[in-house]
Amino acid sequence: SDLANANAVKELVIAGLLISSRKVISGIEWAKTLQGQEGVAKLVEKGKSAFVGPEIKGKRLGVIGLGAIGILVANAAHSLGMEVYGYDPYLSVDAAWGLSRSIIHATSLDQIYANCDYITVHVPLTPDTKGMFNAAAFAAMPDGVRILNFSRADLVNIPDMKEALASGKVAAYVVDFPTEDILGVENVIAIPHLGASTPESEDNCAVMAADELIAFLEDGNIVNSVNFPTVEVPRTTERRICVLHKNVPNMLSQISGVVSATVNGKHELKALV
């Protein structure tokens, strides 16, 4: 669940923002080539100008998708001095409570594309989102935009991304899902799917799985299921009956009648979920 690894991913996204700007990785690789040479300190001072990069403070970040991870990223980036735009047409009321008031509410993807120097995406892969970062999207962005993808590789049209990188439209692409067709491309920072790779995240996942099993076995609540919507109903009686059925007219009333006849008046039927 995103709730278990949200902080781990958030931290790596913030790292991605920094390394997409400051050319730290390429600078480190260059420094390794100086091994065995004389006057390394002087060589470093002479060569470091090739790795100049902008600060993120004061820049504009667009966060697409304001779920558990997106909200943490937006708030953290704002704390670092960025002007943050958030876009999510499906933002829940509960999620909105956790979003800083300072986050600018974008009403469309075009608003994100037109205004932001950095864009990070946190949405599921669906037929609508597959390839959403394509030539048309890049054309709407400012030159030198930096894009971070910690969601799914297929959100990005790779041939279009390569062209955008080659032209300078996209200054850097940070992706947590390396694929053969993107490896080795200049200005691509491919991270080996490390978003949730922390001991804390693994512990959180284990605890959450246990808690969710207990919630189902003891109260019938369903949370974070991959193939069923969330069902959370406060317990008001000692026992409850939950009926999962297709939306057939009068189905619940028929079942209620059968249950009422079965209990034969020995127990009060207060609720049928």
Where in the sequence are the language-model features?
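Rossmann-like adenosine-cofactor binding region
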Residues: P89-I182, S197
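Short beta-strand "acidic-cap" motif of Rossmann-like dinucleotide-binding folds
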Residues: V84-G86
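Short beta->alpha connector loops at strand-helix junctions that form conserved
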Residues: S1-A4, S151, H193-G195
